[in-house]
Each structure stands twice: as C-alpha cells, then as structure tokens.
Amino acid sequence: DVNGNADVSGTLDVDGNVRVVGSMSKGSGSFKIDHPLESKKETHHLVHSFIEGPQADLIYRGKVDLVDGKAVVNIDQIARMTEGTFESLNRNIQCFTSNETDWDVVKGSVSGNKLTIECQNTNSTATVSWMVVGERDDQHMKDTDWTHPDGKIIMEPLKEIVQE
C-alpha cells in the first residue's frame, strides 16, 4: 500500500490488473499479447500501439500508387507482421480510400489480408491514401473482464459498491 507518490525507474511488471483512480498520463501506450498465430504463440508476442475509442479497433493505413487503375496491398507485409496475423487479429473490417491525385472515383475492399483498391478509370496512376479498421478479435480481448462475450468493450460498467 503506497500513500503519496511512487516513483519507478526502469520497468514495472504487474501480473494482474492495474486500476488508476484519477488521471493517467503516458508518453505512449500499447498492448503486448501472445501472438495469435498458433505457430508463433509460444515464441513471439504481438505489439500494437493504442488509439483510444469506444471499440477496441486496430488501424492500418498507408498510401499506394495505382497501376492501370488498381493496387493490391498485403496488410501483413505493410504492418511487418507474419502472414496470417491480420486475419487472426481482426473482425468486422472496414476500408476507406481517398484519391489524392485527381477526381477519379476509387474503392477498396479487403479479403483475407489483401486490400484491393480499384479506380473507375482503368488507366489511373493516382496516389491513393487508404485506411483499414478492424475490431480486435484475439483471445486476450475475449478473456478480459471489460468486454462483452462478443469482444466489444463494456462502455458503461456498473460501479463496484464497497460494503463497510
């Protein structure tokens, strides 16, 4: 039990939950979980940085130049993850594209770990910004006590009432 300030230099490892009553400031934040691929679960972790929001979303983004009106992006490669990690880690995937070069219409779709971007103009060489958002679907997310059984964050949990 610590009253007042506790200063830690180096790394503080906690096995269990940490609860902060009051504000918390951090220079950065991330999750570090067992790798979701069976072949790496015993030998590797998977690390992602956080973005705060009402869902446990993972965001992948980048830019690509179209060739003959099309581009295919391997999300695992772009994120420097092992092939299959994106599919193991995400569900309810959404894709957003924006043509930065001209007014030609572009659209994107994701199948597996491949983002395919197509332009209405099949000769386009436009530069397209893209963003893919998926909800975390790893076992750690399902096992926490701050998510519903479907993995969605419990946004308005009941307060714990302390009996004296």
Name each region found by the language model.
Residues 7, 13, 17-164:
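Extracellular receptor-binding modules and their adjoining Ser/Thr/Gly/Asp/Asn-rich linkers
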